[in-house]
């Protein structure tokens, strides 16, 4: 793919920015780093050049249409159905190039304050408009066999999103209780129904008591990046009838990573 092709296709991406920094790491301020440490989440605008967004879009097209990558369908056949694919890095060359050559690792390294970084996983999430409801509130840590302060998920949307459609986060919740995961088969009836059983405290019903929580979300344009600690409570807003939400999360960890024993089950993403 030559530069003209990249520029032409990049111009078709909705919401892409006309101006961006040659060194986006310099856009991360001490206040951003402090906010991440305090709240467990921070959004920074205009970090990724349209060329990198195009590369991710091509990679997603390959995942959905060409590869043998398994598509995990959550709430299959229900109104909230969405697609997730895990460890695309292993099989999709565009994702490998993004992880190695884009500034994403340097951006995460500055946010979490670690000079050394390791890739844990990457995941695509695809929600088509019209019938996809909320993604239930949850933390990622109950599903992962790791813990530490220097862990971050960089969430990148390929589509412009309103504040209502964006992910939502409970600020500061990464410093509190680690709750059980949600039960996909029961969550529509009871969002606090446990994934494991009685080995971890059940999730609170955040959606029914939103006024009790410091909930953060943003209007997003392609090129913006949300950095979030896996321990922060979060959930996905519904997509509107004429919109879609295609996003990738790059999960990286730094020097203070520790193995964490979880209740007996297969981890969502094994530590390999």
What are these regions (language model features)?
Residues 115-117, 121-122, 133-135, 150-156, ...:
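Generic beta-strand structural signal
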Residues 163-232:
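Double-stranded beta-helix
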Residues 145-162, 219-222, 227, 251-254:
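Short, conserved beta-strand element in jelly-roll/cupin
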Residues 114, 129-131, 160-163, 175, ...:
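Short, charged/polar surface micro-motifs in flexible loops or helix N-caps
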């Amino acid at each position: 793919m030559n530069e003209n092709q990249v520029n032409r296709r990049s111009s078709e991406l909705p919401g892409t920015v006309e101006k961006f920094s040659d060194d986006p790491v310099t856009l991360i301020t001490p206040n951003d780093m402090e906010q991440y440490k305090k709240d467990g989440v921070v959004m920074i605008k205009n970090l990724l050049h349209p060329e990198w967004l195009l590369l991710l879009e091509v990679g997603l097209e390959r995942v959905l249409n060409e590869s043998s990558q398994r598509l995990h369908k959550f709430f299959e056949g229900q109104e909230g159905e969405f697609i997730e694919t895990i460890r695309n890095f292993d099989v999709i060359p565009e994702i490998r190039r993004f992880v190695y050559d884009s500034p994403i690792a340097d951006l995460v390294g500055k946010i979490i304050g670690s000079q050394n970084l390791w890739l844990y996983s990457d995941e695509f999430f695809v929600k088509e408009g019209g019938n996809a409801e909320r993604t239930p509130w949850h933390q990622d840590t109950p599903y992962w066999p790791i813990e530490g302060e220097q862990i971050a998920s960089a969430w990148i949307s390929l589509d412009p999103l309103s504040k209502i459609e964006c992910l939502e986060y409970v600020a500061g919740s990464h410093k509190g209780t680690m709750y059980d995961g949600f039960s996909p088969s029961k969550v529509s009836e009871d969002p606090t129904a446990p994934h494991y059983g009685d080995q971890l405290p059940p999730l609170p019903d955040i959606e029914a008591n939103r006024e009790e929580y410091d909930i953060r979300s943003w209007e997003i344009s392609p090129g913006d990046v949300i950095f979030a600690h896996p321990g922060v409570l979060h959930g996905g807003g519904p997509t509107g009838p004429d919109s879609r939400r295609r996003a990738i999360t790059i999960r990286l960890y730094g020097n203070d990573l520790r193995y964490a024993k979880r209740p007996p089950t297969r981890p969502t993403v094994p530590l390999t």
